[in-house]
């Protein structure tokens, strides 16, 4: 078992570089023009422009080791997206921390925050993890091709269940 907390990445600047490197590696096939600096700039924007919907959350251990990140964003850059947003985006958990509830905690934090902001729906798109999200109450709404790769677009209704009702 890993003991960890989820907090805004804006408050954990010591982890920005690692989070940016992970994000760049994880999604460079989807966003080939992005760089590590792209993510660092997003983290700075999230901290400096609270009026924009761009919030990044990080899971960190009690001894301040970064385990993963997840983002709540108005637009997740999916070309031709019909969905209005907001989006759960850029969920990443380091391989050593998987199967310990880190991903669930990060997703639940984003869901909580979207609900706090009075959104009634939340969207995501995923290349590989649609089955995992379905176990958390997300429903598939369509398939799409993005840069030649199949992705599943999903939605979570925020008006009914509370995050604590979502399965860990």
Language model features: what each stretch is:
Residues 97, 101-109:
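Conserved acetyl-CoA pyrophosphate-binding loop and the N-cap/start of the following alpha-helix
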Residues 125-129, 142-168:
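C-terminal "cap" of GNAT-fold acetyltransferases
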Residues 56-58, 64-75, 87, 92:
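Conserved beta-strand in the GNAT
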Residues 134-144:
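Conserved acetyl-CoA-binding loop of GNAT-fold acetyltransferases
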Residues 1-18, 159-168:
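Conserved N-terminal entry element of GNAT/NAT acetyltransferase domains
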Residues 76-84:
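A short, polar/charged loop-to-alpha-helix boundary motif
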Residues 23, 28-61, 77:
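Active-site rim helix/loop that mediates acceptor-substrate recognition in acyltransferases
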Residues 114-126:
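Conserved GNAT acetyl-CoA-binding A-motif
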């Amino acid at each position: 078992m890993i003991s960890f907390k989820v907090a805004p990445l804006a408050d954990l600047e010591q982890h920005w570089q690692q989070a940016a490197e992970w994000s760049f590696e994880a999604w460079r096939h989807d966003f080939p023009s992005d760089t590590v600096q792209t993510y660092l700039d997003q983290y700075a924007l999230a901290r400096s422009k609270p009026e924009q919907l761009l919030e990044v959350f990080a899971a960190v251990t009690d001894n301040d080791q970064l385990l993963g990140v997840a983002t709540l964003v108005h637009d997740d850059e999916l070309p031709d997206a019909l969905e209005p947003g907001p989006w759960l985006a850029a969920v990443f958990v380091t391989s050593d921390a998987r199967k310990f509830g880190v991903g669930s905690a990060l997703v639940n934090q984003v869901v909580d925050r979207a609900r706090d902001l009075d959104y009634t729906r939340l969207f995501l798109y995923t290349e590989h993890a649609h089955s995992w999200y379905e176990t958390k109450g997300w429903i598939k709404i369509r398939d799409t091709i993005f840069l030649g790769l199949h992705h599943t677009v999903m939605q979570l209704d925020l008006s009914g269940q509370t995050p604590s009702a979502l399965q860990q």
